[in-house]
Amino acid sequence: MKPHLKQWRQRMLFAIFVWGLLFLAIFIYFTNSNPAAPMPSSFSFLESRGLLPVQGKQRVIMGALQEPSLPRSLEPSKVLMDGHSASPFNSWPGDPQKGDQAQDGFDNGDEFFTSQVGRKSQSAFYPEEDNYFFVAGQPGLYHHRQGALGLPSPGESSWQSGPGQPKQEKLRHPRRGSLPEEAYDSDMLSTSMSRAFLYRLWKGTVSSKMLNPRLQKAMRYYMSFNKHGVRFSRRGRREARRTGPELLCEMRKRVRVRTLDGKEAPFSGLGWRPLVPGVPLSQLHPRGLRSCAVVMSAGAILNSSLGEEIDSHDAVLRFNSAPTRGYEKDVGNKTTVRIINSQILANPSHHFIDSSLYKDVILVAWDPAPYSANLNLWYKKPDYNLFTPYIQHRLKYPTQPFYILHPKFIWQLWDIIQENTREKIQPNPPSSGFIGILVMMSMCQEVHVYEYIPSVRQTELCHYHELYYDAACTLGAYHPLLYEKLLVQRLNTGTQADLHHKGKVVLPGFQTLRCPVTRPNNTNT
């Protein structure tokens, strides 16, 4: 019996050894798999909900998104690797000049943009340093639980984990001596943007070359798509080197807020003249407003405690469906003007005609039109049908000031952005935020803009009132948001402290500017 028992034991040991090898092989296989490989389910979710429409009616304008639910496939445990938060922004460590050396995006020809299309990306920027690990295909699933002024809540690290993750160790600083000290205020910066990149954004030294490859692809897609038929002549490159005061004076000379007045075809033939308000938008406050606030809907405004400061202004502009109830401490409760895109009017879920959100305020609507500003073509085929709801609202509330911005005004703003940017920008209209800023600069002596350029509370939460995360909401894909913000940064007359801690930019109103008088050259001898 002993030889048989010994043989049986040997077989058992051999079987255990084989199973051990098999388990080890499986373990090595999964641990060596590439965690940065794209996850199709994640990207398809982002394509459908966050950034770029593919065509026509699926266009997404910032501020009009429906509140989405996060897909089950995006598990929080897959967002982090080795305890490190996935920073979606390139920090450009080691060479602070690298990010500035973006090549001029203009072609040799005088015109660009021909035909159209679009895609979307989940995260705006990607790191090249090993210290920052970005999981491709994952949107910014950062847990939105911050203390006052964007500081992490007790028990959290200053670089937050995904939802439900335990406390993680802080990331190592990438060659701290290579960047100014302000870039490493680790106790103040939130998690979804690298210290170095946010500092560069405050300084206006970022470019599209730092964008995540997918977002760059989305931008190229829109440039080739050119839905609105943009044909722009570059007119030289000196404009991109204008100083802030020079740019302000140029904008004062060219920017004229214009709305539909019912005098142009096809509206004149449709009886719109008595329908539109008798007093033009630019003349509602003939003496001008002293101080105005433009409140962005960015998620970064949460936990800011800016509500009292915002309400102290003479007038407050808000966007689309952004509420105040329940958010008064951070955003205030005063609303004077509300800029709304055409989706707000056309989508029944917004209850535009009956909602109290759109009552007792000045309403200013807009819709993308062809670059040619052909009103007949626009009326026949708007991006979203805002004309019928506009008529219904005017008939029901004839005394409420309600205007539709003229397409020429919208595209005039786009021209100014492109002329003052060395790179090609997306051939799509500016964002509602940029439009609102320019409208208020024409009406107010001083404009305070909150969280257009992000503060230390920067987060991937798109809007403070919607549970939807996407880093692209900060830099855009459909709208040329990156270039808009760089231009506004050049105009800022406020302090760096306000920009960093409040996300506040201060802009002078056009009426307060003292610009040199341009005299025509005397050709007489």
UniProtKB/Swiss-Prot annotation:
EC number(s) reported in the record: 2.4.3.1
Localization: Golgi apparatus, Golgi stack membrane
All ranges on the Cytoplasmic side of the membrane: 1-11
Topological domains annotated Lumenal: 33-525
Listed InterPro entries: Glyco_hydro/deAcase_b/a-brl, Glyco_trans_29, GT29-like_sf
Single GO term (MF): beta-galactoside alpha-2,6-sialyltransferase activity
Highest taxon, organism lineage: Eukaryota
Chain ranges passing through the membrane: 12-32
GO BP term, example: oligosaccharide metabolic process
Pfam families xrefs: Glyco_transf_29
Region (Disordered), start-end ranges: 85-107, 145-183
Keywords: Disulfide bond, Glycoprotein, Glycosyltransferase, Golgi apparatus, Membrane, Signal-anchor, Transferase, Transmembrane, Transmembrane helix
Glycosylated residues in this chain: N303, N333, N521
S-S bonds: C249-C515, C292-C444, C462-C473
Entry keyword Magnesium: no
Keyword check for Transmembrane helix: yes
Function, as annotated: Transfers sialic acid from the donor of substrate CMP-sialic acid to galactose containing acceptor substrates. Has alpha-2,6-sialyltransferase activity toward oligosaccharides that have the Gal-beta-1,4-GlcNAc sequence at the non-reducing end of their carbohydrate groups, but it has weak or no activities toward glycoproteins and glycolipids.
Protein known as: Beta-galactoside alpha-2,6-sialyltransferase 2
Organism this protein belongs to: Rattus norvegicus
Species classification: Eukaryota, Metazoa, Chordata, Craniata, Vertebrata
Primary gene name: St6gal2
